[in-house]
């Protein structure tokens, strides 16, 4: 069971974007892509076959999953734990103990 899932609101705890918040767009084995975080400029060639123009585009790159933490109700970073309730595994915030939706 992954501790961070698509759609979770996270905060960056280390790196150049430390303190910024965003919503998880994609989750990989060890990396997460967060909306508006870790933007890089990518130079794109024009491609008339696809109908794209060339130029410089901002692209969101993945972050390591250890560099982000979930945001609790108080707006602070929280670690995530996993416990069994009624025979099912559920995620909970370690700071508040609040159970996250399945």
From Swiss-Prot:
Cross-referenced Pfam families: ribosomal_L24
Record-linked PROSITE patterns: RIBOSOMAL_L24 (PS01108)
Keywords: Ribonucleoprotein, Ribosomal protein, RNA-binding, rRNA-binding
A cellular component term, taken from the record's GO annotations: ribonucleoprotein complex
GO molecular function annotations of the record: rRNA binding; structural constituent of ribosome
GO terms, biological process: translation
Keyword Ribosomal protein: yes
InterPro entries registered for this protein in UniProt: Rib_uL2_dom2, Ribosomal_uL24, Ribosomal_uL24_CS, Ribosomal_uL24_KOW, Translation_prot_SH3-like_sf
CDD domains: KOW_RPL26 (cd06089)
ATP-binding as UniProt keyword: no
Quaternary context: Part of the 50S ribosomal subunit.
Protein name: Large ribosomal subunit protein uL24
Source taxonomy: Bacteria, Pseudomonadati, Pseudomonadota, Betaproteobacteria, Burkholderiales
Record gene name: rplX
């Amino acid at each position: 069971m992954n501790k961070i899932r698509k759609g979770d609101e996270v905060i960056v705890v280390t790196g150049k974007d430390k303190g910024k918040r965003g919503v998880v767009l994609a989750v990989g084995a060890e990396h997460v892509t967060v909306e508006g975080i870790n933007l890089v400029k990518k130079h794109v060639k024009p491609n008339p076959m696809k109908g794209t123009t060339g130029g410089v585009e901002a692209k969101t790159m993945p972050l390591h999953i250890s560099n982000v933490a979930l945001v609790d109700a108080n707006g602070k970073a929280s670690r995530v734990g996993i416990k069994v309730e009624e025979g099912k595994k559920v995620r909970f915030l370690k700071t508040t103990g609040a159970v996250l939706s399945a």
